[in-house]
């Protein structure tokens, strides 16, 4: 029996037991498909996050504090960090509080429950780069000024999603309600992503003390305060981080009460987490491949056992 005859016989056997053949292949199909989908999604998410971190720049430093420390009687506040910026201009160029506000966003009769509201100072916008510390740029209008922040003005800068969804692209000078308080839109950020609800484009920036009065204090990693600083360049980021850590340790007397990370470290930590998650998910998906392989071996064994007599007759006839 030549190869062509063997192939035709195999196809005939598959057609005879269509359900058995389909179920045998299903395990392998699911396993291979799951691995491909997981790897594709994981790589896509990793690339997206790396792109977001690259937009921030390599000179961003994030500071989070969690209390008064072992022997301290006070927290480090933004004035302490302002002093650092003034004292070390060769390493640090700016600092701003970064307050996540618990605000209910409403325009006329529409609520925007997934819109993020953050309180920042005027230093959040960098005049030299014409963008924020996180890489966002203005499409129109202006950003918060020192006067806005110092006088607690009810003004805001909104993202592209809100500008389109609420104001149909004509947002400047319009009023939006934050927890019942009217805020005037003075600036609109450029579109940075898919401009969907809850995305990075669905954001509002207001003076940080206004945000604090809305009832906040819950930061990204527990109760405390969060600050953003910028170093003079990528090369000075590590030295700038050391200066900030030294100042925080002086107040808290323990590194357990604060965390300082550069944008490069944040990106590395995120990539490590994503890689670990992908390994776990791929391992789980690979179980389907193993189960599918065992299923194929089982069916092959059963098929051969069932057709032992037929195989013997064919061999005796010279097959």
Regions found by a protein language model. Name each.
Residues 17-45, 270-309:
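Hydrophobic alpha-helical transmembrane segments of multi-pass inner-membrane transport and secretion
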Residues 17, 45, 84, 125, ...:
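Residue-level signature of catalytic and energy-coupling elements of molecular machines
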Residues 6-15, 80-85:
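A short amphipathic helical element positioned immediately N-terminal to and/or at the very start
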Residues 98-99, 110-215, 239:
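Hydrophobic secondary-structure segments that place a key small or acidic residue at a functional site
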Residues 42-116, 123-126, 146-147, 164, ...:
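Hydrophobic, regular-secondary-structure patches
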Residues 74, 86-91, 168, 177-182, ...:
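Mechanotransmission and gating elements of multispan inner-membrane complexes involved in transport
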């Amino acid at each position: 029996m030549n190869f062509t005859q063997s192939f035709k016989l195999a196809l005939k056997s598959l057609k005879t037991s269509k359900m058995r053949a389909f179920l045998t292949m299903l395990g392998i199909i699911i396993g291979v498909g799951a691995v491909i989908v997981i790897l594709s999604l994981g790589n896509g998410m990793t690339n997206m996050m790396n792109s977001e971190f690259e937009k921030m720049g390599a000179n961003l430093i994030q500071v989070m504090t969690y209390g008064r420390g072992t022997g301290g009687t006070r927290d480090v506040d933004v004035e302490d960090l302002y002093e650092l910026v003034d004292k070390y201009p060769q390493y640090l160029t700016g600092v701003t509080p970064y307050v996540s506000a618990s605000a209910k966003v409403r325009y006329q009769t529409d609520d925007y429950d997934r819109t993020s509201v953050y309180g920042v100072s005027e230093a959040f916008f960098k005049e030299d780069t014409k963008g924020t510390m996180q890489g966002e740029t203005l499409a129109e209008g202006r950003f918060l000024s020192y006067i806005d922040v110092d006088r607690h003005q009810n003004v805001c800068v909104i993202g592209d999603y809100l500008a389109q969804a609420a104001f149909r692209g004509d947002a400047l000078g319009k009023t939006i309600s934050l927890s019942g308080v009217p805020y005037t839109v003075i600036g609109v950020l450029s579109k940075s992503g898919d401009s969907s609800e809850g995305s990075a484009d669905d954001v509002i920036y207001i003076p940080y003390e206004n945000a604090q009065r809305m009832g906040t204090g819950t930061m990204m990693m527990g109760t405390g305060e969060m600050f953003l600083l910028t170093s003079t360049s990528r090369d000075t980021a590590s030295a700038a981080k050391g200066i900030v850590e030294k100042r925080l340790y002086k107040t808290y007397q323990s590194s357990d009460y604060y965390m300082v990370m550069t944008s490069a470290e944040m990106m590395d930590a995120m990539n490590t987490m994503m890689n670990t998650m992908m390994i776990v998910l791929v391992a789980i998906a690979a179980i389907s491949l193993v189960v599918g392989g065992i299923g194929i071996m089982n069916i092959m064994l059963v098929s051969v056992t069932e057709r032992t007599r037929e195989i013997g007759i064919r061999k005796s006839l010279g097959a």
